[in-house]
Amino acid sequence: MAILKWKLKRSTVQEVSIAGPASYSTTTSTQASTAVSCSASEECVQAPPCKRQRGPSRPIGNPQNTQSIVCVTDYDTLDSANNNINVNHYNNNKGRDNSYCAATPIVQLQGDSNCLKCFRYRLHEKYKDLFLLASSTWHWTAPNNSQKHALVTLTYVNEQQRQDFLKTVKIPPTITHKLGFMSLQLL
C-alpha cells in the first residue's frame, strides 16, 4: 500500500530532480501543464536555458609568462617605423625589425580623394602584383578636423614587397605617403 501511495504521489508531482543538473524544457507552457501536474502547495518553475560559455575553456599557453603574448602594443603609438618608439613593452628591439610580431607593412597615401581613387585604379591595373590589398578612400573624423585630405592604405606581404613597390611605382607629387605597420590581422 505504501508503494502504491508513493507511485501515485510521484506521478502527480513534477519529475525533476532538485539535486541533478538543470535543463531547459522545449515544451510550451500549455504542453507542460498537461504533461506535469503540480499540487497547489508546490510551484512549477522551469529552469532557464543554460548560457553558452564564451572564449576558450582553459587559458592558452602559460598565464604567468607574458613573453608568449604576441604584439602587446602601446596604445599611444601608431607607427613602429620610428626608431624612438617602443611599440612592445616586452620587446628589447627598438629598431624597425618587426619580425617578432604579426604586423603587416603598409604605405599610407594622403591627398585629394579623387586623385587617390584614380591612383588606386591605376595600381590595380598596372601594379597589382606589387601590393596585397588597397583600402577604399577614407577620412579621419573629428569635430575639429579642418583637414579634408583623404587616405588610402596599401598592405604588403613583407617589407621587401613594399620596397619593390616604392622603387617601381612613381607616386604623383600631389599624393604624400608614409610607411608603417598595421598590427591587425587581415583576411
UniProtKB/Swiss-Prot annotation:
GO cellular component term of the entry, any:
host cell nucleus
User: In the record, which residues are listed under signal peptide?
Assistant: none
**Highest lineage ranks of the organism?**
Viruses, Monodnaviria, Shotokuvirae, Cossaviricota, Papovaviricetes
Q: Its biological function?
A: Plays a role in limiting the replication of viral DNA in keratinocytes. Recruits the host NCoR/SMRT complex to viral replication foci to mediate repression of both viral replication and transcription.
User: Which organism does this record belong to?
Assistant: Human papillomavirus 13
Q: Report a single Gene Ontology molecular function.
A: DNA binding
Provide the protein's localization.
Host nucleus
> Some GO term, biological process aspect, for this entry: which one?
regulation of DNA replication
Q: Which family does it belong to?
A: Belongs to the papillomaviridae E8^E2C protein family.
Alphabetized, the UniProt keywords read: Host nucleus
Its protein name is Protein E8^E2C
Q: Tell me the domain of life.
A: Viruses
Which Gene3D superfamilies does the record associate with it? 3.30.70.330
